[in-house]
């Protein structure tokens, strides 16, 4: 199973939030590029970036930091990014910079047809990010919980060419309370698209549980606060995941 370190960007710095609250940001690094290099050196085979300011503004807000990260590691490992991606022009600009994939979140919920258009324009490069609270999709940087169930939304994207779905349980994100395995597996089994778990990864027991769920469609996991605060040693966790494959 692939473990993917997260680098959340706020005003050019690497931070972690609790439950998506910008006022609950903990700064972990003033140099996101150095952070990216660190995770690469620890054995990361992919990086997950989030433009937090962009998620709220609806347009890219951390381009200098993103460019620095890509200059540091994009030649070695694929980098994906979400946050503020609302149109095809932005997707094209990001891919031209060297990103491997882009993640459509809020725009996928508000306008599912946009996902189909993006997949046609950039085949194989589109990931859908579905963030949920109690199974219901959240949008606009998690500020609004909609009346749409994530499974119903995910099924709409099955034939569009989406390469994966990132499922985040926002009640768990940054809270160190464990991954919501049941909800992640339920989503993975409901669709033909690989699902990446996100939110709440706490320790090696979560890694073992996720690896056990791999045969049921859970293709990987994004980890953030746990690897920054040290409750998970990333290199050790990836080695464990590899040994359980």
UniProtKB/Swiss-Prot annotation:
It holds the Pfam family His_biosynth. One of its GO terms (biological process) is L-tryptophan biosynthetic process. GO terms for cellular component: cytoplasm. Its EC number is 5.3.1.16. It is an enzyme of class 5 (isomerase). GO terms for molecular function: 1-(5-phosphoribosyl)-5-[(5-phosphoribosylamino)methylideneamino]imidazole-4-carboxamide isomerase activity. This is 1-(5-phosphoribosyl)-5-[(5-phosphoribosylamino)methylideneamino] imidazole-4-carboxamide isomerase.
């Amino acid at each position: 199973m692939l473990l993917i370190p997260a680098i959340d960007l706020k005003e050019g710095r690497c931070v972690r939030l609790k439950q998506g609250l910008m006022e609950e940001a903990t700064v972990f690094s003033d140099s996101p590029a150095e952070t990216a290099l660190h995770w690469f050196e620890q054995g990361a085979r992919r990086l997950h970036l989030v433009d937090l300011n962009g998620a709220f503004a609806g347009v890219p807000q951390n381009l200098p930091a993103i460019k620095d990260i890509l200059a540091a590691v994009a030649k070695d490992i694929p980098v994906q990014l979400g946050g503020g991606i609302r149109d095809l022009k932005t997707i094209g600009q990001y891919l031209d910079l060297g990103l491997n994939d882009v993640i459509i979140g809020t725009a996928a919920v508000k306008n599912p047809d946009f996902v189909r258009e993006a997949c046609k324009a950039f085949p194989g490069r589109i990931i859908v990010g579905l963030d949920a609270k109690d199974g219901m999709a959240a949008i606009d940087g998690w500020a609004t919980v909609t009346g749409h169930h994530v499974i119903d939304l995910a099924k709409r994207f099955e034939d569009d060419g989406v390469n994966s779905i990132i499922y985040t349980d926002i009640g768990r994100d940054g809270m160190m309370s464990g991954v919501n395995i049941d909800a992640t597996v339920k989503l993975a089994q409901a669709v033909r698209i690989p699902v990446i778990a996100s939110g709440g990864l706490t320790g090696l027991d979560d890694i073992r549980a996720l690896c056990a769920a791999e045969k049921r469609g859970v293709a990987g996991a994004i980890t953030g606060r746990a690897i920054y605060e040290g409750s998970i040693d990333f290199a050790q966790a990836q080695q464990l995941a590899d040994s359980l494959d």
